């Protein structure tokens, strides 16, 4: 599984100051990507909330700091302010994870085409459960699943070539042959969501009852989102939710 933050909303501090909202002078982390270290999403959420009451001057000392203000917003459940900023990830995960993730309709997807791209070149993602086993069991099952994948690749290529030999365009041949591909097939995708959407995804998938691979993905998304919007995700635990 791979997840990489590739884009995030940036604010125009000068424009906000002209309106009357003074932007906090955050110090960027020395350990993180400098392009995504200024917490613009947190600032934008606060600005949006304060605009509702024209409270840019921060009259309440208890919510004068961004962290405290957003904590109050979260407590009240007024999460629409988190919709103004977005984050985009490049993700490589199994087709199974794609199916789960696409159920979150508030996310936007661009996914590799199995009609135009040969999926056998993209690799596979083995279930996380295998890597919790004793090494002997793990190695045996990894070998079995990789062998099955190789066999399916051969069957896939045979079907594609057979159909192409009968005159079908390659994309139509791949369209038919993809029926034999397993759920562990790698499915590179670009996924964008606003921070309210990402909060919903993580709160649903960062849970011990969730599918193991998507839970692992949710944890990685949370880690990276906290680098750009720590106060937006301040209420989400470092370990998966439990019953």
Swiss-Prot record:
FAD binds at residues 80, 103-105, 194-196. Keywords: FAD, Flavoprotein, Methyltransferase, NADP, Nucleotide biosynthesis, Transferase. DUMP binds at residues 100-103, 113-115, 178, 205. One of its GO terms (biological process) is methylation. Binds 4 FAD per tetramer. Each FAD binding site is formed by three monomers. Disulfide bonds: none annotated. Homotetramer. PANTHER family: FLAVIN-DEPENDENT THYMIDYLATE SYNTHASE (PTHR34934:SF1). This is Probable flavin-dependent thymidylate synthase. The lineage of its organism: Viruses, Duplodnaviria, Heunggongvirae, Uroviricota, Caudoviricetes.
């Amino acid at each position: 599984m791979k997840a990489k933050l590739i884009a995030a909303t940036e604010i125009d501090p000068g424009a906000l100051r002209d309106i009357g909202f003074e932007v906090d002078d955050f110090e960027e982390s020395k350990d993180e990507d400098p392009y995504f270290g200024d917490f613009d999403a947190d600032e934008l959420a606060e600005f949006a909330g304060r605009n509702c009451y024209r409270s840019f001057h921060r009259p309440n000392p208890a919510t004068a700091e961004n962290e405290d203000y957003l904590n109050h917003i979260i407590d009240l459940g007024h999460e629409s302010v988190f919709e103004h900023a977005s984050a985009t990830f490049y993700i490589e995960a199994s087709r199974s994870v794609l199916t789960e993730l696409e159920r979150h309709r508030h996310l936007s997807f661009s996914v590799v085409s199995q009609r135009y791209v040969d999926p056998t070149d993209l690799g596979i993602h083995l279930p996380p459960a295998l890597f919790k086993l004793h090494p002997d069991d793990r190695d045996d099952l990894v070998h079995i699943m990789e062998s099955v994948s190789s066999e399916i690749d051969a069957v896939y290529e045979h079907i594609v070539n057979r159909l192409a030999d009968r005159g079908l365009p390659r994309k139509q041949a791949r369209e038919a042959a993809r029926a034999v591909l397993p759920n562990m097939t790698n499915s590179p995708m670009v996924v964008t969501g606003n921070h309210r959407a990402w909060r919903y995804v993580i709160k649903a998938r960062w849970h011990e009852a969730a599918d193991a691979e998507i839970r692992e993905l949710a944890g990685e998304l949370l880690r990276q989102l906290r680098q750009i919007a720590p106060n937006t995700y301040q209420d989400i635990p470092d370990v998966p939710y439990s019953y």
